[in-house]
């Protein structure tokens, strides 16, 4: 893609590797970042705390390298939505977090809700800014693998088609002269999770190990949920050591070090 300069980005940053790495990519592209993290009643509320830490560190790296800067980080409290999003593993206390993918892991059109808020803010920060404004989310190409039963995307609101439809709708819903906001995701750029991790590690190094993927909040990644397993698989596929601390091994090749399990590829002490 061609990024118009000067540029600013409203980034939805969860604290996970996908949104963190994609934000780093846009900082490297020279765009200033207005970061938004969302409280939406999720069980893994620790991810927002990680986002705050990671964005501070990313801004330090960006300053050293002459990239764009993290202008601000706002936490948007939509926690009351957790009462509406019932029956999903991520928000409903009565629904257990599964060890493999089932449709109940999907929070219905969560990305659409967040993208709508982010785009509304983008129209605000972009007004009279004299810069091209983008909205970015971390959904990647692996999120849209087909389900085995219906062949629909695993996570429908992560698809490029959904992203492009949102962009069109949000433009139609605003004034003609201010319709320049674009919405981008790794999936729209054709990037897989492992590709994001590899690119990110080349730029920010071990910072990627401080991201949070687990669907639960705990002292370390649980290692048993689908997201933990996807995280580990992506590190291995990217040819990177997985230095994530897990409570249980998400795959083969792990050894216990102290309280946690680390993969044998990790040489960190």
Swiss-Prot record:
Keyword ATP-binding attached: yes
Catalytic activity: 7-carboxy-7-deazaguanine + NH4(+) + ATP = 7-cyano-7-deazaguanine + ADP + phosphate + H2O + H(+)
Residues that bind Zn(2+): 214, 222, 225, 228
Short name of one Pfam family: QueC
Source taxon at top rank: Archaea
Alphabetical keyword list: ATP-binding, Ligase, Metal-binding, Nucleotide-binding, Zinc
Coiled-coil segments: none
InterPro entries according to UniProt: QueC, Rossmann-like_a/b/a_fold
Cofactor binding: number and manner: Binds 1 zinc ion per subunit.
Pathway assigned in UniProt: Purine metabolism; 7-cyano-7-deazaguanine biosynthesis
UniProt-annotated binding residues for ATP: 13-23
Cofactor section: Zn(2+)
EC identifiers of the protein: 6.3.4.20
GO MF annotation list: ATP binding; ligase activity, forming carbon-nitrogen bonds; zinc ion binding
Protein family according to the UniProt entry: Belongs to the QueC family.
Stated role: Catalyzes the ATP-dependent conversion of 7-carboxy-7-deazaguanine (CDG) to 7-cyano-7-deazaguanine (preQ(0)).
Record protein name field: 7-cyano-7-deazaguanine synthase
Organism placement in taxonomy: Archaea, Thermoproteota, Thermoprotei, Thermoproteales, Thermoproteaceae
């Amino acid at each position: 893609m061609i990024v118009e300069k000067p540029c600013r980005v409203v980034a939805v940053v969860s604290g996970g590797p996908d949104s963190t790495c994609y934000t780093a990519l846009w900082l490297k592209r020279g765009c200033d970042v207005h970061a938004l993290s969302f409280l939406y009643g999720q069980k893994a509320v620790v991810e927002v705390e990680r986002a705050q830490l990671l964005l501070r560190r990313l801004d330090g790296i960006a300053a050293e390298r002459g990239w764009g800067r993290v202008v601000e980080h706002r936490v948007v409290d939509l926690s009351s939505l957790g009462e509406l999003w019932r029956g999903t593993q991520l928000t409903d206390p009565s629904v257990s977090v599964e060890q493999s993918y089932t449709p109940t892991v999907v929070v219905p059109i969560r990305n659409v809700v967040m993208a709508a808020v982010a785009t509304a803010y983008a129209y605000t920060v972009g007004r009279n800014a004299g810069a091209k404004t983008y909205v970015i989310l971390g959904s990647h190409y692996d999120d849209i693998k087909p389900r085995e039963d219906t062949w629909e995307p695993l996570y429908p609101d992560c698809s490029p088609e959904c992203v492009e439809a949102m962009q069109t709708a949000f433009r139609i819903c605003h004034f003609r002269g201010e319709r320049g906001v674009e919405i981008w995701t790794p999936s729209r750029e054709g990037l897989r999770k492992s590709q994001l991790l590899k690119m990110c590690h080349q730029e920010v190094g071990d910072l990627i190990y401080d991201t949070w993927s687990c669907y639960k909040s705990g002292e370390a990644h649980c290692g048993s949920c689908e997201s933990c397993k996807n995280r580990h698989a992506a590190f291995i596929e990217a040819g990177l050591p997985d230095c994530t601390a897990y409570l249980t091994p998400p795959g083969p090749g792990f050894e216990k070090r102290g309280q946690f399990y680390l993969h044998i590829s990790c040489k960190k002490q």
